[in-house]
Regions:
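Histidine-anchored nucleotide/phosphate-binding helix
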Residues: 24-28, 136-140, 159-169
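Conserved glycine(s) of the Walker
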Residues: 14-15
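Switch II (G3) loop of P-loop NTPases
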Residues: 100, 104-132
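Hydrophobic anchor at the beta1->P-loop junction of P-loop NTPases
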Residues: 7
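N-terminal phosphate/diphosphate-binding loop that engages ATP/GTP or pyrophosphate donors
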Residues: 4, 18-94, 98, 103-106
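Inter-motif core of Ras-like GTPase G domains
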Residues: 129-153
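Charged helix-capping and loop-helix junction motifs
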Residues: 129-137, 162-164, 190-195
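C-terminal lobe/tail of nucleotide-utilizing enzymes
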Residues: 165-228
């Protein structure tokens, strides 16, 4: 059975999928058996045959040169670009933890280092109906995963990143580190954001990703040690 790491973002559109692709690519280029899994994906676009295409999973599969079929990489796919709980309700396909856990465990059995990507931020609702209330952090906790946070380097990131760290700690979920995305070297505000986040949380920023980067600048042993 392999090791796993969960990737969350401080919100939507912070570049979580982009960074996840770089992480899996880094592992695989180092000769390691690195894989990808996502429980639920919304906003999928149909192809010419009407089949929904899970864009995030397809992107990581392409960037990291993953050979597994796309059906192994994501469990629930919805066309609406909504929060998963709403997309699931509209399509009458509620997210079932038992099915997610089964697919997750299968993915772990196939990969030595499995990177699981979340949906939106850590408090994203996955299911909210008369039978069950399940947020993304519930899923992470029940799967016993540590979390790596992807944060936008720009204005507003101090608040979002510190709140994400504090929420994870309140839920007793291990925080493995932070990756700063959309970083501009020499930008005084972004550098101050990084310093303030590290001082306020005690969590290290492990890598800085610039726009257009095709490689993740992080020591491979450090990256491997984030997985458990």
């Amino acid at each position: 059975m392999g090791k796993a790491l969960f990737i969350t973002g401080t919100g939507t559109d912070v570049g979580k999928t982009y960074v996840t692709g770089l992480i899996v690519r880094k592992l695989r280029q180092a000769g390691l058996n690195g894989g990808y899994y996502k429980a639920a994906l919304s906003g999928a676009v149909p192809d010419a045959n009407g089949e929904l295409q899970p864009g995030d999973a397809l992107y990581v599969k392409h960037v990291a040169e993953i050979e597994e079929p796309i059906r192994n990489l994501v469990t629930y796919v919805y066309p609406e670009a909504f929060s998963p709980h709403l997309a699931a309700e509209i399509n009458h396909r509620p997210i079932d933890f038992k099915r997610v856990k089964k697919d997750f465990e299968r993915a772990k059995s196939r990969n030595d280092y499995l990177t699981m990507e979340g949906s939106g931020g850590i408090i994203c609702p996955l299911r909210w109906d008369n039978q069950q209330h399940m947020l993304l952090d519930d899923l992470v906790k029940r799967l016993h995963l540590g979390v790596l946070i992807v944060a936008d380097a720009g204005l507003g990131t101090i608040n979002g990143t510190v709140l994400t760290v504090e929420h994870l700690r309140a839920r007793e979920i291990p925080v493995r580190g932070i990756i700063f995305n959309k970083y501009t070297p020499g930008d005084i505000m972004q550098d101050d954001n990084a310093s303030m986040i590290e001082e306020m949380t005690g969590v290290k920023i492990l890598a800085y990703v610039k726009k257009g980067d095709t490689e993740l600048d992080i020591d491979i042993d450090m990256l491997k040690n984030l997985y458990a």
